[in-house]
Amino acid sequence: MSLYMLVSTFAVAFIITVIGVPLFIPFLVKLKFGQSIRDEGPKMHEKKSGTPTMGAVIFITAMLISFLIFSFISGEVSAATWLLFITLALFGALGFLDDYIKVVQKRNLGLTSKQKFLGQVAISILFYLVYHFSDFAETLKIPFTNTEIDLGWFFIIFILFWLVGFSNAVNLTDGLDGLVSGLSVIAFSAFGVIAFYQEQMDVAIFCFAIVGGMLGFLLFNKNPAKIFMGDTGSLALGGSIAAVSILVHQEWLLLLIGIIFVIETASVILQVFYFKATGGKRIFRMTPIHHHFELGGWSEWRVVLTFWGIGLIGAIISVCVVIF
């Protein structure tokens, strides 16, 4: 019965997305909600200018509908259900505001860094408050052991770092057609299997709703992309995957399951630090690191497939660590 629920959750999110996206694309085109390409980006990306963005509105809607339907049908409505719901919805809303400013008000950078950060912090604090008053364990598991450390009030610092950090990490990674969509399918599949193995059906249902929605969206987001998810999607997915890792108490495995997100973010941090320390020298041709490979002659599709492969290896290892 539980496996049937997961398959059904996946299927409904997938079907709604596959039906909804083709209907949404002409609407976005009519409103001229097209992606602007930053001048400092790779020149080969200029052809993407005007591609409809904010496609995440469809797959987030599909995910939330499927998630809630099968959470109630299965009787698996819990505090975790509402934590995941508000995380996906609120990070998505923050991203939507950022996208709206970019495409409607024609401010290419969207929200300022300070505004976006304050929004992320506010959502993370709300997550902590719901988590805290739901009597979840505020502990951190030591990797490859069964030992957990009680963080006490320091747990809120960890929550802020984890949710804000990974929402930004996924946002940084979303620069190539299909890259984040495919990585999300891989990562949430891994966490879905882990949650199912740990008998956390509420979290597993959420994960497979996301897998269904993202796989449906990938059909239109793969190279050459007909639509982009925008910050609406990348912030929502990043915040959600961090939340899932906390709820299944496998936080550190996210560093392996989401290894590409970590590498992409690290490349930006290293580039900025080295640039400032050396007075203008660079480690990479351009960051995030996927652009480094593009400028080195790799096709966009080759970069995406390679990064998917690395993400898949990390996900398989992580699932094996938990199960075996």
Swiss-Prot record:
EC no.?
2.7.8.13
What protein does this entry describe?
Phospho-N-acetylmuramoyl-pentapeptide-transferase
Gene from which the chain derives: mraY
Return the GO cellular component terms, semicolon-separated: plasma membrane
The entry's family comment says: Belongs to the glycosyltransferase 4 family. MraY subfamily.
Q: What residue ranges are annotated as transmembrane?
A: 9-29, 53-73, 77-97, 117-137, 149-169, 176-196, 201-221, 227-247, 253-273, 304-324
Q: Which reaction does it catalyse?
A: UDP-N-acetyl-alpha-D-muramoyl-L-alanyl-gamma-D-glutamyl-meso-2,6-diaminopimeloyl-D-alanyl-D-alanine + di-trans,octa-cis-undecaprenyl phosphate = di-trans,octa-cis-undecaprenyl diphospho-N-acetyl-alpha-D-muramoyl-L-alanyl-D-glutamyl-meso-2,6-diaminopimeloyl-D-alanyl-D-alanine + UMP
Q: Which GO terms describe its molecular function?
A: metal ion binding; phospho-N-acetylmuramoyl-pentapeptide-transferase activity; UDP-N-acetylmuramoyl-L-alanyl-D-glutamyl-meso-2,6-diaminopimelyl-D-alanyl-D-alanine:undecaprenyl-phosphate transferase activity
Question: How does it sit in the bilayer?
Answer: Multi-pass membrane protein
Question: Pathway, per Swiss-Prot/TrEMBL?
Answer: Cell wall biogenesis; peptidoglycan biosynthesis
Keyword terms? Cell cycle, Cell division, Cell membrane, Cell shape, Cell wall biogenesis/degradation, Magnesium, Membrane, Metal-binding, Peptidoglycan synthesis, Transferase, Transmembrane, Transmembrane helix
The top EC class is transferase
Origin, by domain of life?
Bacteria
Tell me, which GO biological process terms does this entry list?
cell division; cell wall organization; peptidoglycan biosynthetic process; regulation of cell shape
Q: What is its main location?
A: membrane
InterPro entries documented for this protein: Glycosyl_transferase_4, PNAcMuramoyl-5peptid_Trfase, PNAcMuramoyl-5peptid_Trfase_CS
Cellular compartment(s): Cell membrane
Q: What does this protein do?
A: Catalyzes the initial step of the lipid cycle reactions in the biosynthesis of the cell wall peptidoglycan: transfers peptidoglycan precursor phospho-MurNAc-pentapeptide from UDP-MurNAc-pentapeptide onto the lipid carrier undecaprenyl phosphate, yielding undecaprenyl-pyrophosphoryl-MurNAc-pentapeptide, known as lipid I.
Which Pfam families does the record cross-reference, listed alphabetically?
Answer: Glycos_transf_4
**Calcium among the record's keywords?**
no
Give the required cofactors.
Answer: Mg(2+)
Asked if the keyword Transport belongs to this entry, the reply reads no
